[in-house]
Amino acid sequence: MQIKTEEISQIIESQIQNYEQRVEMSETGTVLYVGDGIARVYGVRNAMAMELLEFPGGLMGMVLNLEEDNVGVALLGPDTDIKEGDPVKRTGKIFSVPVGDAVMGRVLNPLGQPIDGEGPVDSKEFRPVELKAPGIIARKSVHEPMPTGIKAIDAMTPIGRGQRELVIGDRQTGKTAVCIDAILAQKNTDIHCFYVAIGQKRSTVALVADTLKKHGAMEYTTIISATASEPAPLQFIAAYAGCAMAEYYRDSGKHALIVYDDLSKQATAYRQMSLLLRRPPGREAFPGDVFYLHSRLLERAAKVNDSLGAGSLTALPIIETQAGDVSAYIPTNVISITDGQVYLEPNLFNAGIRPAINVGLSVSRVGGAAQIKAMKQVAGTMRLDLAQYRELAAFAQFGSDLDKATQAKLNRGARLVELLKQPQYQPMPFNEQVASMYAATRGFMDDVPVASIRKFEAEYIEFLRDAKGDILKDLDEKKAIDNDIEGRMKAALEEFKKGFTA
């Protein structure tokens, strides 16, 4: 056997040249205290706010408090296996979530991990959950409509792309249903939807996912779920995680809609964390920065200017009130941050007016500029008619001898209230809304019995679809009522009324 010394020396030389001395440096600390989803860690001197720390067993924690000799960490999972003295490692990463089309149609937890049993999320891009909102120069005023398919909202409190419209009301008044309808209405649009469930029951989230699937809306929707059984830090961070995923579309020149259900529970989770981290309590035991908690989240919803891609992110935050008290701490905070609110009332809900929207207390501060012209033309007088109706209805209880004008207003108002009722999960296209409201506001329904208004509307829309499809098509294309369309609509109504039996 001949030993080739040259060959051996070449191999040794190449090995020496390719040798890399790698030393993995990691800053570690020690758990001083753990309990209630909070850990105090000593030794990680260079930790950053919102940085992820790794605990034994792969559990992650997020740095929230930076103190003189230790850091307060919110644990993003169960703390049962962590004990005092355990080693903790810095990751050097700020909390980020996967973004892009890979998350569409999925049900995720706030860490971006799938919980729908459909395999991993194959995303190449990640985005930090906490990002600065666009500045003043980067924004453009809200001017494009975002129809929700709900007549009462599209007519009187219209929502534009890039707006923040609060949905507020007591428990069981249909707040989630209104927002789910808004998601269903985006079916044939270019809007990507996100539903963030914070502190909800698991059965509720399963029902929402099932409803979206049944109506074919899940393909353009992502659900981020932090249910009531999850630790408070996950409930707190869920809204920001959902917002980061939705912002990806805003910054790519596309459009997104995000529903936060609900921010009252997020504030409660944040209060729990803050008190456990020994931050000083303020009003209603909330920490001093609870306003900033919501403002920095909702300011990220914006209409971006053309030079940045003209994308938009529309937010529908939900707030649950206690016994109709909209002047409590969290409701007033969020009302002052948002661009208007849709107020749902239990009295209306129990009276069978559903969606139970109180059109007197509901406002849209910027949506008017985004409202479709045709809708403006038919719904312009509607708010006034309904306000007069409510005022007169209160007086009419005391006296029976009313003059003709008052009776006419009461009759018209009763029919408008009936017209604004709508079944759940049946959003209405805007051209059909315009057609039915035109009939009501121009007096074509004044002689129809109140009990038959819904029947009149359904049959009239069916008649238009079958026999007068060109009217609906022209409304859809022109987005306004000109003399030609108005003449054809009047003729169609007169023709339909001849054959209609209440």
From Swiss-Prot:
Catalytic activity: ATP + H2O + 4 H(+)(in) = ADP + phosphate + 5 H(+)(out)
Cysteine-cysteine disulfides: none
GO molecular function: ADP binding; ATP binding; proton-transporting ATP synthase activity, rotational mechanism
SUPFAM superfamilies: C-terminal domain of alpha and beta subunits of F1 ATP synthase, N-terminal domain of alpha and beta subunits of F1 ATP synthase, P-loop containing nucleoside triphosphate hydrolases
Subcellular location: Cell inner membrane
Transport listed as a keyword: yes
Sequence positions that bind ATP: 169-176
Topology of this chain in the membrane: Peripheral membrane protein
EC number(s) on file: 7.1.2.2
One GO cellular component term noted in the UniProt record for this chain: plasma membrane
Pfam families to which the protein is assigned, alphabetical: ATP-synt_ab (PF00006), ATP-synt_ab_C (PF00306), ATP-synt_ab_N (PF02874)
Keywords: ATP synthesis, ATP-binding, Cell inner membrane, Cell membrane, CF(1), Hydrogen ion transport, Ion transport, Membrane, Nucleotide-binding, Translocase, Transport
Domain of life: Bacteria
InterPro entries named among the record's database cross-references: ATP_synth_asu-like_sf (IPR023366), ATP_synth_asu_C (IPR000793), ATP_synth_asu_C_sf (IPR038376), ATP_synth_F1_a_nt-bd_dom (IPR033732), ATP_synth_F1_asu (IPR005294), ATPase_a/bsu_AS (IPR020003), ATPase_F1/V1/A1_a/bsu_N (IPR004100), ATPase_F1/V1/A1_a/bsu_N_sf (IPR036121)
Site (Required for activity): 362
Quaternary data: F-type ATPases have 2 components, CF(1) - the catalytic core - and CF(0) - the membrane proton channel. CF(1) has five subunits: alpha(3), beta(3), gamma(1), delta(1), epsilon(1). CF(0) has three main subunits: a(1), b(2) and c(9-12). The alpha and beta chains form an alternating ring which encloses part of the gamma chain. CF(1) is attached to CF(0) by a central stalk formed by the gamma and epsilon chains, while a peripheral stalk is formed by the delta and b chains.
General function of this protein: Produces ATP from ADP in the presence of a proton gradient across the membrane. The alpha chain is a regulatory subunit.
Similarity annotation: Belongs to the ATPase alpha/beta chains family.
The name this protein goes by in its record: ATP synthase subunit alpha
Higher taxonomy: Bacteria, Pseudomonadati, Thermodesulfobacteriota, Desulfovibrionia, Desulfovibrionales
